C-alpha cells in the first residue's frame, strides 16, 4: 500500500484525478487509472491526468481514461491541468506550453483576484483525411450517410487530437448510449468519440458526447470543438459559437491559428490515498 497525493478537478462536469509523477514512479499508469477512477472502490473519475517533466515544453500531461486506455488529448482535462500546475507553482506564467500526446498545446489562464476563473486552449487544426482520423473511407467523411447495425446516420468524422464523429440532428433523436455502437463500428479502426449535435442558431449549439474509453460524459472539450468545426464546415454556424453541454457551456472559436476553446476549470478537493494497491 502506498500514499498518493492528488486533486479532484472538473471542467464543466468532465472530472479527473490529477497527480504529480516527476520521477516516473508509476510505470503501470493503466492500472493506476482503473483503480483510482473506480467510483465504488476508488475515488471515481472519467480519467487521470499525470504531471511529468517535459523536454519539449514547460510541462507534460499524460491522460488515461477510466478504462485504462491512453488519450492523446482532452480539452476539459487540459484546462484542469493548466489550472493545477499554475495553482501549485509548477509554472510561473499565465501562458503555458503543455506537452500532450497530440503535440504541444498552448494554454492561457484568465486570472481574477489571484484565482483562475477560466482557461483558453489552442486545440490545433483538425484534419478530415480518412487515414489520419482514422476512418475507412476513400473520401473525407462530411455529412455522409452510413449504416451501423440496423440504424442509419449522417456523420462527419475528423481528427482533433483524438478521433471524433459528429451527428447533427435534434439532440433528443438518439440516446447518448447509442454512441457505444458507433464507437465500436469497424469503420473506425481505433474507435471514435461520438457527438450528437443540434444547431440552435448561428451562434449556439447543443452537444452530448459518448466518449471513447469513458462512456457518456457531462462534457467533452475536443468533442465540443469538433462539433463546431463540423457545423462551421457545413455553413450552419459562425466562427465563434457557444456550446451547451450537460455540465455547462464552453465557447469555441475557429481561427487561422487553430480552434480556440474557453471554459471553466474547478478544483473540487485535494486528498491522499491510504489503502490502495497500485502494484498490479
What are these regions (language model features)?
Residues 128, 140-142:
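Zinc-dependent deaminase
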Residues 121, 156, 220:
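Beta-strand scaffold of nucleotide-dependent catalytic cores
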Residues 100, 118-126:
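Membrane helix-loop-helix hairpins that form the core translocation module of multi-pass transporters
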Residues 125-127, 160-164, 265:
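Glycine-rich beta-alpha junction loops
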Residues 127-131, 270:
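Short, charged/polar, Gly/Pro-enriched secondary-structure boundary elements
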Residues 142-172:
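Internal active-site segments that recognize and position negatively charged phosphoryl groups
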Residues 1-115, 165-280:
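A glycine-rich beta-to-alpha transition motif near the start of alpha/beta enzyme domains, typified by
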Amino acid at each position: 500500500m502506498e500514499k498518493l497525493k492528488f486533486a479532484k478537478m472538473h471542467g464543466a462536469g468532465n472530472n479527473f484525478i490529477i497527480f504529480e509523477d516527476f520521477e516516473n514512479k508509476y510505470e503501470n499508469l493503466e492500472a493506476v487509472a482503473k483503480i483510482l477512477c473506480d467510483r465504488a472502490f476508488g475515488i471515481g473519475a472519467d480519467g487521470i491526468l499525470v504531471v511529468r517533466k517535459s523536454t519539449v515544453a514547460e510541462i507534460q500531461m499524460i491522460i488515461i481514461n477510466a478504462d485504462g486506455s491512453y488519450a492523446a488529448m482532452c480539452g476539459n482535462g487540459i484546462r484542469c491541468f493548466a489550472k493545477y500546475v499554475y495553482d501549485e507553482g509548477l509554472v510561473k506564467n499565465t501562458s503555458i506550453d503543455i506537452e500532450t500526446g497530440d503535440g504541444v498545446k498552448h494554454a492561457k489562464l484568465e486570472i481574477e483576484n489571484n484565482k483562475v476563473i477560466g482557461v483558453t486552449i489552442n486545440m490545433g487544426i483538425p484534419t478530415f483525411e480518412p487515414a489520419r482520423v482514422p476512418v475507412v473511407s476513400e473520401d473525407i467523411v462530411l455529412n455522409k450517410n452510413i449504416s451501423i447495425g440496423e440504424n442509419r446516420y449522417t456523420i462527419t468524422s475528423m481528427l482533433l487530437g483524438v478521433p471524433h464523429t459528429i451527428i447533427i440532428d435534434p439532440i433528443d433523436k438518439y440516446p447518448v448510449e447509442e454512441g457505444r455502437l458507433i464507437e465500436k463500428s469497424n469503420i473506425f479502426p481505433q474507435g471514435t468519440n461520438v457527438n450528437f449535435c443540434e444547431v440552435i442558431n448561428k451562434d449556439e449549439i447543443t452537444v452530448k458526447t459518448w466518449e471513447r474509453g469513458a462512456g457518456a460524459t457531462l462534457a467533452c472539450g475536443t468533442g465540443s470543438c469538433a462539433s463546431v468545426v463540423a457545423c462551421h464546415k457545413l455553413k450552419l454556424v459562425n466562427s465563434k459559437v457557444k456550446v451547451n453541454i450537460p455540465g455547462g457551456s464552453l465557447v469555441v472559436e475557429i481561427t487561422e491559428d487553430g480552434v480556440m476553446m474557453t471554459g471553466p476549470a474547478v478544483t473540487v478537493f485535494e486528498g491522499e490515498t491510504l489503502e490502495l494497491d497500485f502494484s498490479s
